[in-house]
Amino acid sequence: LAGTVARSGLIDKRGIKVGDLVLMTKAVAVEGTAIIAREFGSRLQDLGLAPDEIETCRRFLDNISVLPEAAVAASVNGVSAMHDVTEGGLATALEELSSAGNHRIRIDMHKIPVYSETARICGLLGLDPMGLIGSGSLLLCCRQYACDQLLREIRKAGIEVSLIGEIREPGKGIDAQHQLQPVTWPRFEADEITRLFSA
């Protein structure tokens, strides 16, 4: 996909600064949850997932576009970066964002939204949702003064959004914490979904 944009409207990841806040829309592993429900429905049913729960997960694909929230974010002054989550899940996407913006990122693990259906499926199959393909979720960075407006406008559009972290000093990498305690950031050589298809 290629296109043009006025220089004044360009949102470049290299523009992130120390103190910018990090938001994500929807939840982790939206696409991965849907794919697993579509491709491994019988297996999930054998593991105890009800047919209506599986159907709910399949319909996650109906909500996979990030264009609506990207359009809203582009209209808010103070947005410094956007990055869509894809293969490798949220963990990989945040590493990519850090690398592209050349700043470390602090992430509050307990603030990362996980749909109950995703948690259930990943628990049954032994997968980590942080490394599961996550198309459908958009990462956003913004100046602190813009955060409240950005949250408000995205929610007004009917889209879930959460504040999950903050841009730190120049460099590359993720500083993860849970309830203010440092924790190890998960890294994945391949998307978690490949373990299902290669089994």
Regions found by a protein language model. Give the residues of each.
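Active-site glycine-rich loop that binds ribose-phosphate moieties when present
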Residues: 1-12, 52-71
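A generic local secondary-structure boundary/capping motif
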Residues: 7-15, 25, 70-71, 95, ...
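Active-site-proximal betaalpha loop/short-helix elements
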Residues: 58-134
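Acidic, Ser/Thr/Pro-rich beta/coil linker or hinge segments at domain junctions
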Residues: 156-199
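Helix N-cap motif at beta-to-alpha junctions
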Residues: 142-148
